[in-house]
């Protein structure tokens, strides 16, 4: 069991990077549906935050089972704000909108990756950073209330894809 958890901890960043490179700014059919639903529905964004929270809790559990140190407790404390949807929404929006904050978070994650005992903090920071890249920007969410945005579906979808990132 412990070997499986070590394997998950080791492979997770690489799987997340592969997912990022395969899906970021791609116009696949399921990604278009994802873009549209996350922009148009608050419940879809809420579900996205719940899935992110579930992944973070699972990673914290894997870290706790394999390495019990203070970094795991710090990673668990970093996960707590994602239990509140409005706070998680604000965090993901700020990371998505501010390139400086996103790069700082990723640099901090890479620094934590170099120290073996800080792996759990790396996993939380890296997962949240990648998740914020797929979160819709505030600009495209505010565009959905404009009167000219409610034309036909195809035009609406093209505007969402254009301004999503």
Language model features by range: what are they?
Residues 3-26, 43-165:
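Alpha-helical transmembrane segments and immediately adjacent membrane-interfacial amphipathic helices
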Residues 30-41:
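Membrane-interfacial, low-structure loops and terminal tails that flank and connect transmembrane helices
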